[in-house]
Curated annotation (Swiss-Prot):
The gene is secB. It is found in: Cytoplasm. Belongs to the SecB family. GO terms for molecular function: unfolded protein binding. This is Protein-export protein SecB. It comes from the Bacteria. GO terms for cellular component: cytoplasm. One of the proteins required for the normal export of preproteins out of the cell cytoplasm. It is a molecular chaperone that binds to a subset of precursor proteins, maintaining them in a translocation-competent state. It also specifically binds to its receptor SecA. Pfam families: SecB. One of its GO terms (biological process) is protein transport. Keywords: Chaperone, Cytoplasm, Protein transport, Translocation, Transport. Its main location: cytoplasm. It comes from Shewanella frigidimarina (strain NCIMB 400).
């Protein structure tokens, strides 16, 4: 019986405690002139994630999105969103925890951030903007690979 209780205590657990908007900004630096031009934007998306340990098994993960739309040489709009979540994560190895914080949690947060960006752009009276899905697993794998390459480079230097 004690063995079963011990196994349950070690079983991986993942819980979302809260998802919230930490910060947001929407700017149209060239309005109203930008509305007078033909709409042919170049949209750029920058992503960043970070995490903070709040307690032994509780983490805050912050997904930052910056969307910049340029119409010709002029910036049509700049939208910055920080979507955050508080997650309870227990029973994972260090590698599994790093993956959860760097890929799984951002995957959970992205739909909320994408919706917020779309709403802000719409309220700015620009045409609808639907951000494409992001493969955070691939981005995290690329990040790990870059860190390993940098560590190898330092070791050989």
């Amino acid at each position: 019986m004690a063995e079963v209780a011990n196994n349950e205590a070690q079983a991986p657990q993942f819980n979302i405690q809260r998802i919230y908007t930490k910060d947001l900004s929407f700017e149209t630096p060239n309005s109203p002139a930008v509305f007078q031009k033909e709409w042919n934007p170049e949209v750029k998306l920058d992503l960043d994630t970070r995490s903070n340990k709040l307690s032994d098994d509780t983490y805050e993960v912050i997904l930052s999105l910056t969307v910049t739309a340029k119409n010709g040489e002029d910036t049509a709009f700049l939208c910055e969103v920080q979507q955050a979540g508080i997650f309870s994560i227990v029973g994972l190895t260090e590698q599994q925890l790093a993956h959860s914080l760097g890929a799984y949690c951002p995957n959970v947060l992205f739909p909320y951030a994408r919706e917020l960006v779309g709403n802000l752009v719409g309220r700015g009276t620009f045409p609808q903007l639907n951000l494409a899905p992001v493969n955070f697993d691939a981005l995290f794998a690329q990040y790990v690979q870059q860190r390993q390459a940098a560590a190898t480079e330092e070791a050989t230097a």
